[in-house]
């Protein structure tokens, strides 16, 4: 699943390609992906001009001024822009014909992606309902509320971080990297962490997600940015996908366990419970 760095990289690519473009027509082959009114999606979007490409957590936001589309890529979603004829592909599900003759296509092998067409005034309430935490920046992700939330939760730290309520954007790849960098075992109950460990988790969340953005995201399986390019963050991962390899910090073997149904990578020496 694309995590925050991948979605931000897609956003930046789409921004370069789409700002100022007007939707002339659209086709939806998988109506279940449209989570708001299907008829409104078909009838209200033609004539709308893309004024901004924004992001909130793992959600992409196409901003038309009064209207917005909130798009979630889920497991395998990606956007492709074709300047002339669109090739046949059974995994192409949404087609946006643009005023310069190009076509923006949404591709999704799993068909899990979602689209919500909303009035911009509904955006804040939408993300409030999702209980989405702050963006992982020094300005928005404050330590004191984070510490307070950890102290009041007995959940294992990894599943807790993946809920998106404490901070937006972490997924399976980056949470493993954050906890390794913070020397915290993923199964540790949040309220059992020392305050020093809580601070390390907080600071490494910001640092590693920002590094992921700088490196254009991680291309592990199928991820590409909006320009069709691979990310490079996979070259900087320390534990994710490194089972049986030496820990970069202590040379112990990286192991993989199951936690909350997810494969979880850690160093048993550096990340003691």
Swiss-Prot record:
Q: Which UniProt keywords apply?
A: DNA damage, DNA repair, DNA-binding, Glycosidase, Hydrolase, Lyase, Metal-binding, Multifunctional enzyme, Zinc, Zinc-finger
Cofactor binding comment, as recorded: Binds 1 zinc ion per subunit.
Question: Which residues does UniProt assign to the signal peptide?
Answer: none
Question: What are the recorded GO MF terms, alphabetically?
Answer: 8-oxo-7,8-dihydroguanine DNA N-glycosylase activity; class I DNA-(apurinic or apyrimidinic site) endonuclease activity; damaged DNA binding; zinc ion binding
A Pfam entry, by short name? H2TH
**Needed cofactors:** Zn(2+)
Zn-finger segments (FPG-type): 238-272
Query: What SUPFAM superfamilies does this protein map onto?
Result: Glucocorticoid receptor-like (DNA-binding domain), N-terminal domain of MutM-like DNA repair proteins, S13-like H2TH domain
The record's section on InterPro entries has: DNA_glyclase/AP_lyase_DNA-bd, DNA_glyclase_Znf_dom_DNA_BS, Formamido-pyr_DNA_Glyclase, FPG_cat, MutM-like_N-ter, Ribosomal_uS13-like_H2TH, Znf_DNA_glyclase/AP_lyase, Znf_FPG/IleRS
Record-annotated active site: 2 (schiff-base intermediate with dna), 3 (proton donor), 58 (proton donor), 262 (proton donor)
Q: Which residues form a coiled coil?
A: none
Listed Gene3D superfamilies = 1.10.8.50, MutM-like, N-terminal
What the entry lists under PROSITE patterns is as follows: FPG_CAT, ZF_FPG_1, ZF_FPG_2
Provide the catalytic activity annotation. Hydrolysis of DNA containing ring-opened 7-methylguanine residues, releasing 2,6-diamino-4-hydroxy-5-(N-methyl)formamidopyrimidine; 2'-deoxyribonucleotide-(2'-deoxyribose 5'-phosphate)-2'-deoxyribonucleotide-DNA = a 3'-end 2'-deoxyribonucleotide-(2,3-dehydro-2,3-deoxyribose 5'-phosphate)-DNA + a 5'-end 5'-phospho-2'-deoxyribonucleoside-DNA + H(+)
Enzyme Commission numbers on file: 3.2.2.23, 4.2.99.18
GO biological-process terms attached to the record? base-excision repair
Q: Where does DNA bind?
A: 91, 110
What does the annotation say about its assembly with partners? Monomer.
Tell me, in a sentence or two, what this protein's role is: Involved in base excision repair of DNA damaged by oxidation or by mutagenic agents. Acts as a DNA glycosylase that recognizes and removes damaged bases. Has a preference for oxidized purines, such as 7,8-dihydro-8-oxoguanine (8-oxoG). Has AP (apurinic/apyrimidinic) lyase activity and introduces nicks in the DNA strand. Cleaves the DNA backbone by beta-delta elimination to generate a single-strand break at the site of the removed base with both 3'- and 5'-phosphates.
The record's section on PANTHER family has: FORMAMIDOPYRIMIDINE-DNA GLYCOSYLASE
**What's this protein's family per the entry?**
Belongs to the FPG family.
Q: Which HAMAP family match?
A: Fapy_DNA_glycosyl
According to UniProt, the name of this protein is Formamidopyrimidine-DNA glycosylase
State the organism of origin. Answer: Streptococcus thermophilus (strain CNRZ 1066)
User: What taxonomic classification does the UniProt entry list for its organism?
Assistant: Bacteria, Bacillati, Bacillota, Bacilli, Lactobacillales
What gene is it encoded by? mutM
């Amino acid at each position: 699943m694309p995590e925050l760095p991948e979605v931000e990289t897609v956003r930046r690519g789409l921004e370069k390609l789409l700002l100022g473009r007007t939707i002339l027509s659209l086709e939806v082959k998988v109506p279940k992906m449209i989570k708001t009114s299907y008829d409104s999606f078909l009838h209200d979007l033609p004539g709308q001009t893309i004024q901004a490409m924004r992001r909130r957590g793992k959600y992409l936001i196409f901003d038309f001024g009064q209207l917005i589309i909130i798009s979630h890529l889920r497991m395998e979603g990606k956007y492709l822009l074709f300047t002339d004829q669109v090739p046949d592909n059974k995994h192409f599900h949404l087609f946006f014909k643009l005023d310069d003759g190009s076509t923006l296509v949404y591709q999704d092998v799993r068909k899990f992606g979602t689209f919500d067409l909303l009035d911009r005034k509904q955006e804040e309430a939408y993300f409030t309902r999702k209980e989405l935490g702050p963006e992982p920046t020094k300005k928005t992700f404050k330590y004191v509320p984070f510490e307070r939330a950890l102290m009041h939760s007995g959940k294992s730290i990894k599943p807790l971080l993946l809920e998106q309520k404490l901070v937006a954007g972490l997924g399976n790849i980056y949470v493993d990297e954050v906890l390794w960098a913070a020397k915290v075992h993923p199964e540790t109950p949040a309220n059992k962490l020392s305050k020093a460990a809580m601070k390390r988790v907080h600071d490494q969340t910001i640092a590693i997600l920002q590094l992921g953005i700088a490196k254009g995201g991680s291309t592990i399986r199928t991820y590409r940015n909006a320009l069709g390019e691979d990310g490079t963050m996979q070259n900087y991962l320390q534990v994710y996908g490194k089972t049986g390899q030496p820990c970069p910090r202590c040379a112990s073997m990286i192991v993989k366990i199951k936690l909350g149904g997810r494969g979880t990578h850690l160093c048993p020496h550096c990340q003691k419970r």
